[in-house]
From Swiss-Prot:
Region (Phosphate acetyltransferase): 390-714
Domain free text: The N-terminal region seems to be important for proper quaternary structure. The C-terminal region contains the substrate-binding site.
EC number: 2.3.1.8
Protein name per Swiss-Prot or TrEMBL: Phosphate acetyltransferase
GO cellular component: cytoplasm
Organism: Vibrio cholerae serotype O1 (strain ATCC 39315 / El Tor Inaba N16961)
Biological process according to GO: acetyl-CoA biosynthetic process
Catalyses which reaction(s): acetyl-CoA + phosphate = acetyl phosphate + CoA
UniProt pathway annotation: Metabolic intermediate biosynthesis; acetyl-CoA biosynthesis; acetyl-CoA from acetate: step 2/2
Enzyme class: transferase
Length: 714
């Protein structure tokens, strides 16, 4: 039997959309099938505009989403005393999306001056749908007693705290900066220069838990990253003319500085994520911003006012700085008018800002009560699919429990530094950065990254000498001498590999700068393959909208023979099982079953036979065409008796050309996230990165490596 949860805000400005996204993510992490419904649209501007939460959900997830009624239609029915008609429409649309869901999440109306009927309508909808009520509140400047009283007042509108339908409350924006009236304002006043001096309640989580009249289901701390908008969104709001595009689509604004002072008094504000607002006739500010950019500081953007043009000579002088990605745009009007326009900028997350939506979802989900989320599926059949959010959550949890040390030879590479900081902050792994300590700290400062506990920095020049003798011993049969060993140890991948060989670290991740060959060659020479492995292969985890698939081998073996292909299939199946994916292995070919002949398909057929013989416990079939392996309707006609066709989770390709082409085609055409390649068959875990890897790619590769290290010791 499915359950219905209704989120009801006790006031305006509680961050309802963020809580909805986070609660959905928390349930998806557990593999719960969810649907979402906002009965009445409530856009910030214009009563007949699309609803924000529904739009965000529809563009960024594959869950079923109910069609909201427009606010004007709802107001007409309420004004005509036709609440019964409104509720019948709500029930009709609710029934369209809750049939196959274990949990349906309902988002209630926010009580505002324009919508004073919100509490009444919320109560009627909750009662009609038999929903369990979860209030959403924000403390503002309340002390625990005042917050308790506000929650009690909210409960009184729904039958009081003894109402068994009230499940609890989620506290959002804990310890956020607030204005003089105690409101957490949804505009840029939160990130102006004086934000550091704004009032903060500084409530302790335990105080809230101890005083709340109902169960606290989550306490979500405020973070500046939750409202860090893209530079392009700011430019669009101001209808600004773009002078230099740069990284305008990806740079984030975390603070705003009006450059009215002299340069020496503003240097501290030239920092990552800052929007520098200056009159276009202040060349000193523009040049100072250019110097900061040339030094690696990722300033959010420069906003010019006053209607002046930048002199051509100045543009030419600053061009190298502009080429670093520094966005520059010009607003009409003077600085005062621009300031007023900025105040009206909405910090609601745009539906196309996938990066921020992902951060908000993960941040909120991480602060929702886990046992309560687990309880939502009691009495309902658990979903067997492993969704991408569930898989990513499982990765981080398994990595945390493994608690491993991972060496990163490219320790001064900016993406690697960021990833290491994230891993340390989340407890994913203890990262060891190889590189000049001063250079690493400089790169971290430029990126606005703090290198706290959980990160160790090792200077290669200091550490190299102690590995010389051991490297000579290991490679003596290949003619290794002390002179050559010292030369090779100048390569940080070789140094990291020696640390791994000496059990000083548990795994190695490289490749953001190094080629695949340069990353893999030293471990193959020094670490070698696992005792039960005849080769090293790789897999990618492909995060489809509703499940995670494994593709192998798409990175290492150009043209494996039948024996090698069988080994790749077995390795890939074991890796899938280790990461919570039930392995159903499809051996891919251009032909299904016995319909085709030729050397290529015969190789796949023989590999399938060998794999079955070696591992009769595996569910494996082949040769299968890709469509027969993944689509049930095709499988029904092409391979009706196959235990794998139509429901394969592990896809083993006949050669590197086929595998790599398929992986990239699926990833790019479907705009999917993939994690990998993860190497299999090494005696100790070593993983290679793509040189185009994003920070998140590196984080999850570190997590994979930590998990592999934990499994090696079992």
């Amino acid at each position: 039997m499915s359950r219905t949860i209704m989120l009801i805000p006790i006031s305006a400005g509680v961050g309802l959309t963020s809580v909805s996204m986070g609660l959905l993510r928390a349930m998806e992490r557990k593999g719960v099938s969810v649907s979402f419904y906002k009965p009445i649209a409530q856009p910030r501007t214009g009563d007949d505009q699309p609803d924000l939460t529904s739009t965000v959900m529809s563009r960024n997830s594959d869950i079923k989403i109910g069609q909201p009624m427009s606010m004007s239609a709802a107001e007409t029915l309420i004004g005509s005393e036709k609440m019964d008609v409104l509720l019948e429409t709500v029930v009709e649309r609710y029934n369209q999306i809750n049939k196959d869901a274990e949990v349906t999440l309902i988002e209630g109306l926010v009580p505002t001056r324009k919508h004073p009927f919100a509490n009444q309508v919320n109560a009627e909808i909750a009662n009609t749908l038999g929903a369990e009520i979860v209030f959403v509140a924000t403390p503002g400047t309340d002390n625990p007693t005042q917050l308790k009283e506000r929650i009690e007042v909210a409960c009184s509108n729904f039958g009081g705290t003894k109402n068994k339908s009230i499940s609890g409350v989620i506290i959002n924006k804990l310890n956020a900066p607030v204005d003089e009236a105690g409101r957490t304002r949804p505009d840029l006043s939160e990130i102006f220069d004086d934000a550091d001096h704004a009032k903060q309640a500084n409530l302790e989580v335990m105080q809230i838990f101890n005083t709340s009249p109902i169960r606290v289901l989550g306490c979500v701390p405020w973070s500046i990253d939750l409202i860090a908008t893209r530079a392009i969104d700011m430019a669009k709001h101001l209808k600004a003319e773009i002078i230099n595009q740069g990284d305008i689509n990806t740079r984030r604004i975390k603070s705003i500085t009006f450059c009215a002072r002299s340069i020496p008094n503003m240097i501290e504000h030239f920092k990552p994520g800052s929007l520098l607002v200056t009159s276009a006739d202040r060349p000193d500010v523009i040049v100072a911003a250019a110097l900061a950019a040339m030094n690696g500081v990722e300033i959010g953007a420069v906003l010019l006012t006053g209607g002046y043009d930048i002199p051509r000579e100045l543009v030419s002088l600053c061009k190298p700085a502009f080429d670093t990605g520094l966005p520059i745009f010009k607003a009409q009007g003077n600085t005062w008018q621009t300031s007023l326009n900025l105040q009206s900028f909405s910090l609601e997350v745009p539906a196309d800002d996938k990066e921020r939506i992902e951060f908000i979802s993960e941040h909120v989900a991480s602060h929702i009560d886990g046992p309560w989320v687990d309880s939502l599926t009691e009495g309902a059949q658990a979903s067997r699919r492993l969704s991408p959010p569930a898989f990513r959550y499982q990765l981080t949890e398994l990595a945390r429990s493994a608690n491993k040390r991972i060496v990163l030879p490219e320790g001064d590479e900016p993406r690697t530094v960021k990833a290491a900081a994230i891993c340390a902050e989340r407890g994913i792994a203890q990262c060891v950065l190889l590189g000049n300590p001063e250079e690493i700290k400089r790169v971290a400062a430029q990126q606005g990254v703090e290198l706290g506990s959980g990160i160790e920095i090792i200077d290669p020049k200091v550490a190299q000498e102690k590995y010389v003798a051991r490297l000579v011993e290991l490679r003596k049969s290949k003619g290794m001498t002390e002179v050559v060993a010292r030369e090779q140890l100048e390569d940080t991948v070789v140094l990291g590999t020696m640390m791994l060989e000496r059990n000083e670290v548990d795994g190695l991740v490289s490749g953001a700068v190094h080629t695949t060959a340069n990353t893999i060659r030293p471990p193959l020479q020094i670490i070698k393959t696992a005792p039960n492995a005849s080769l090293v292969s790789s897999i990618f985890f492909m995060l489809l909208p509703d499940q995670v698939l494994v593709y192998g081998d798409c990175a290492i073996n150009p043209d494996p023979n039948a024996e090698q292909l069988a080994e790749i299939a077995i390795q890939s199946a074991d890796s899938a099982a280790a990461f919570g994916i039930e392995p159903r292995v499809a051996m891919i070919s251009y032909s299904t079953g016995t319909s085709g002949q030729g050397a290529d398909v015969d190789k796949v057929r023989e590999a399938t036979r060998i794999a079955k013989e070696k591992r009769p416990d595996l569910v494996i079939d082949g040769p299968l065409q890709y469509d027969a392996a993944i689509m049930e309707n095709v499988a029904a006609s092409k391979a009706p008796n196959s235990p794998v066709a139509g429901k394969a989770t592990v896809f083993v390709f006949p050669d590197l050309n086929t595998g790599n082409t398929t992986y990239k085609a699926v990833q790019r055409s479907a705009d999917l996230v993939s994690i990998g390649p993860m190497l299999q068959g090494m005696r100790k875990p070593v993983n290679d990165l793509s040189r185009g890897a994003l920070v998140d790619d590196i984080v999850y590769t570190i997590a994979l490596t930590a998990i592999q290290a934990g499994q090696e010791q079992k």
